[in-house]
Amino acid sequence: MNYHSTNVNEIWDACLRILQDIVDERAYRTWFLPIIPVSIEGDTLTLQVPSQFFCEFLEGNFVEQLRTVLGRVIGPNASLQYNALVDNSSPKYPGTVTLAGCADGGQAAEQFDVNLLHRHMPNAATHSEAQDFDTQLNSRLNFRNFYQSECNYVARSVAEAIAASPGNTPMNPFFIYGASGVGKTHLCHALGLRVREMHPRLKVLYVSSHLFEMQFTTAARMGTINDFIAFYQQVDVLIIDDIQWLIGKKKTQLAFFQVFNHLYMLGKQIVLTSDKPPVDLNGMEERLVTRMAGATCVKIERPDLKLRREILQQRTLQSGVRLDESVLNFIAENVCDNVRELEGTLVSLITNSVVVGKEIDLTFAKRIVRQAVRLEKKEVTIECIQQAVSRVFQVQIEQMKSKSRKQDIVQARQVVMFLSKKHTAQSLSAIGELMGGRNHATVLHGCRCVTNEMEMNASFRSSVERAEQLIAN
């Protein structure tokens, strides 16, 4: 042992000091600080990691650094053993993983516990078949222009690990969630494109859940549902964006469940995105929620200041426009919600500058940015509408969702349906599902009742308008 101590905490502290110098700060904080040293026996160091996924990620991305550290601190015969805490979301991978240290640069020997589930690589199509397959991927949305910061670092790291070995890691399925415009779609395309680069024989498919639902509806109308399901079951890497749009569409959910199960059992990679975590997908079938809750779930946070500045700098370079630092800082500090809003504000600023023939100084930027931010509409949700209607009509939300036929409760329920149809992009089925499991015909009837009553009853119309004002504010 090179480090003259038998205290495991001292040995791991020595390892951390070296690691801090050879990996970047984000990686150090994310992947090494959570590790707990357990024991040192001879030349074998045992560490406790939060999950099997954590362990696999370390092996896949930091094995060379770990070899270096083990060699310097423990010696050339060092070995590293992980005790992975078993979490309920990943029951497939219990047990311990051992990685023999190779400080002399030799090949590492990875020994997995025998009770780990055997993982099959996807059956590969021929090269020509995979290349001819329409992936629906956008080549402009790649890892090279997916800018990284604290808010998306873990999601990107996991996506890159998956792309290196799709379907052959514990990160399957991979569930990405976060607010609209934070980069979920970009990351999905980048992951798919990287798989195509590294594994040209694999069939990769990106599809929005809206398109999936439209294709299913067409197949149902034409009596070709089996062909529809068979098409999706041939895919090696399936990426479905905005899975929350399947809420309330029970038949489409059933078809998706069949595809999901088939691909999962064959070891194919599944990637899903949503604006909320699986447990909050009210209106999704319980068995689907259970499958998704068992995925590796990673949230992309809203862009931090560092990321907003970097995006603005890169976009201005690409557009050939030079902006003063004070202008960049003002935009970055005041347009905070998402990347889409940030880029839209920059485009608006440049366009206004060209149209009026005025140089972009701080005064000009403040005027345009304030207009853009003020014009940005607040996202309206059904939950927000329920709260507003409950307050105005003095009916509890749970009463609205109940089976009660009392006139005041029915009326409040119908107002929620009416305003949800008017102010959100949710389907009638999704609205009905969130209003106590009602069908689209009930929602449509409720909307008509509200419209008719508003035409005849000024007091009722005033109450509906008050609810709308609450929603807007």
Swiss-Prot record:
Name this polypeptide is given: Chromosomal replication initiator protein DnaA
Chain positions covered by the region annotation Domain III, AAA+ region: 136-353
InterPro entries hit by this protein: AAA+_ATPase, Chromosome_initiator_DnaA, Chromosome_initiator_DnaA-like, Chromosome_initiator_DnaA_CS, DnaA_C, DnaA_dom, DnaA_N_dom, DnaA_N_sf
Comment, domains: Domain I is involved in oligomerization and binding regulators, domain II is flexibile and of varying length in different bacteria, domain III forms the AAA+ region, while domain IV binds dsDNA.
Positions of region (Domain I, interacts with DnaA modulators): 1-76
GO MF annotations in UniProt: ATP binding; ATP hydrolysis activity; DNA replication origin binding; lipid binding
Keywords on record: ATP-binding, Cytoplasm, DNA replication, DNA-binding, Lipid-binding, Nucleotide-binding
GO CC annotation: cytoplasm; plasma membrane
Similarity-based family: Belongs to the DnaA family.
GO biological process, one term: regulation of DNA replication
